[in-house]
């Protein structure tokens, strides 16, 4: 769907898209650095999330791993929800989740499905993680660091992550050529 975030693109793909869009528009378009991404995500907050700490109810704010992940438990040729009494149920509900929260969505959704942060940005936590143009080096770090890494940083977590893996400070490292199932990008 057009309103869905792009996923399964590598860092290299994202940077190439930014390069071509810059060329076409005459504007300098790129990915944010990790520091720029975190500043935009926090939107003036010093908490784990722009709306509170790790235990805040994210149901109306973000698309994270919640009780809707139980909907992955299906069976049959025409997949139907699996009854909790089914002996196989426990093997299909292994994904870690916050069962006390229901954000209403199982997988990634359009950008404006949840509330925007105070800067007007949507889905900074959850939905899909986002590439930054920063190398995965010691954190926190100085932007002028000489340290480098073969990995690039993705921030924000996704619909499959619990809050502790989607907080403002949470980072994930991937090779620049990796096309990760739950990672997309945001341009600046």
Mark where each language-model region is.
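Functional-site microenvironments in short loops/helix caps that host divalent-cation chemistry
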Residues: 1-170, 181
